Each structure stands twice: as structure tokens, then as C-alpha cells.
Curated annotation (Swiss-Prot):
GO terms for cellular component: nucleolus. A zinc finger (CCHC-type) spans 77-94, 100-117, 124-141, 152-168. It comes from Schizosaccharomyces pombe (strain 972 / ATCC 24843). This is Uncharacterized protein C683.02c. Residues 40-49 have a biased composition (Polar residues). Pfam families: zf-CCHC (PF00098). Coiled coil: none annotated.
Length: 218
């Protein structure tokens, strides 16, 4: 059996054309986007700088308040050695050589309050008359005596001793009363007023003696 085919011309395909790349065009609103991004960056930078500025201001205010509290505490202090405000005896520049020793016996192991001996203060130096043998509180040239902030003994108006050490008060007729002090006004060297109230001995009432019953026996 024979087969007949159509023997036509051979089909030809088109040749491939070369690929041409085109440059992408930028959108028209690209300038707007750049402006928006730059404005956002500026806002972030300004916000960060303002935040840092606020933190610096807070630190400055905190430091100012701290220094103000220190100055307030120093104003309330009073030195019993040089009679000046702003420091206490332990920090006094004029009394640095003598504060660490006992004014009575000269020992460096204890202070005057802990000394067991009795006698004059040989190692003490007065900061008013600059003489040895007494403290500035007992100096006759000191008008304030033991009361650097003012005041006197409540019984004899003397400034050379405290009210509890006054000789005009007979301790046999005096009972220890309550301690009177104003909070916030007394300093480390200020005398706190010890009030001793005189008590009048009230007559004691005698109880009536009951008569003893007598037993009569028959």
C-alpha cells in the first residue's frame, strides 16, 4: 500500500531580534517623597535633641537642689570652738590641732566627756582671748558664754553655766521635770533648756484611826 505526502517547501521561522533594555523613568512625585523623608528625619533629630535638652535641665535642677540642701544644713551648724556658723567643732580649721586630745589630761585616746580625772582644763585654748586653761564658753570676754545662739540660765541669767548646774537651785527641794526643746532650732552646741520645777510639799492627810473594839468577858 502506497502513501502519498505533500512535499511542500520547508517552513522558515523568523530570526530573533536583539533585546533592547530601556532606562526606567523616575516617577513624577519622587521629589515629594524625598521631602517627606527629610522632614521626618528632621523631626526625629529635633525630638532627640529636645529630649537630651530636657534631661540636661533635669540634672541641673537636681544638682541645684542638692547644693541648696547642703548649704541649708551648713547654715544650721554652729561651731562651739571659733563661734562661727557653717561647721561644727570636728570640722573647725582653727581647732584641728586641739580637738583630738582631751582638754583636761591631754590624752589622745578619749575626749573631755570621757575623762575620769578632775581638775582644770590645762590643754584647752580659748578662741576669744587666745589663752590656755579654759574654753571659749567659760571665757569672761565672751558675752554669750555657753549660749552661742543667745540665751542664759533660766534661774540666775548667767551665761557661764547651764540651768541644770545653777547654784541657786537647791537640788534637795527640786524634782526633775520634763525637758523642753524646740524641734529644728537646737544645734549641736546649743543648751537645751532643762526645766526644774519646784514642788511644794503638800500636807499629807492622815487617815482617821478606827477605834479598836474591846472584848468584855464575864
Amino acid at each position: 500500500m502506497a502513501r502519498i505526502t505533500n512535499m511542500g517547501k520547508r517552513k522558515r521561522f523568523l530570526e530573533a531580534t536583539p533585546y533592547e533594555s530601556k532606562v526606567l523613568e523616575q516617577p513624577k512625585n519622587s521629589s515629594n517623597t524625598n521631602e517627606e523623608s527629610s522632614s521626618q528625619d528632621n523631626m526625629k533629630a529635633s525630638f532627640g535633641s529636645s529630649k537630651r535638652y530636657d534631661e540636661r535641665q533635669k540634672k541641673k535642677r537636681s544638682e541645684y537642689r542638692r547644693l541648696r540642701r547642703i548649704n541649708q544644713r551648713n547654715r544650721d551648724k554652729f561651731c562651739f570652738a571659733c563661734r562661727q556658723q557653717g561647721h561644727i567643732v570636728q570640722d573647725c580649721p582653727e581647732a584641728k590641732d586641739n580637738v583630738s586630745i582631751c582638754f583636761r589630761c591631754g590624752s589622745k585616746e578619749h575626749s573631755l566627756n570621757a575623762c575620769s580625772k578632775k581638775g582644770p582644763l590645762k590643754f584647752a585654748k580659748c578662741f576669744i582671748c587666745h589663752e590656755n586653761g579654759h574654753l571659749s564658753g567659760q571665757c569672761e570676754q565672751n558675752p554669750k558664754g555657753l549660749y552661742p545662739k543667745g540665751g542664759c540660765c533660766k534661774f540666775c541669767s548667767s551665761v557661764h553655766h547651764l540651768a541644770k548646774d545653777c547654784d541657786q537651785v537647791n537640788k534637795d527641794d527640786v524634782s526633775f521635770g520634763h525637758v523642753v526643746g524646740v524641734a529644728g532650732t537646737t544645734g549641736a552646741d546649743e543648751d537645751v533648756y532643762h526645766e526644774y520645777a519646784k514642788t511644794v510639799a503638800a500636807p499629807t492627810k492622815k487617815r482617821p484611826v478606827k477605834p479598836v473594839k474591846k472584848l468584855v468577858t464575864f
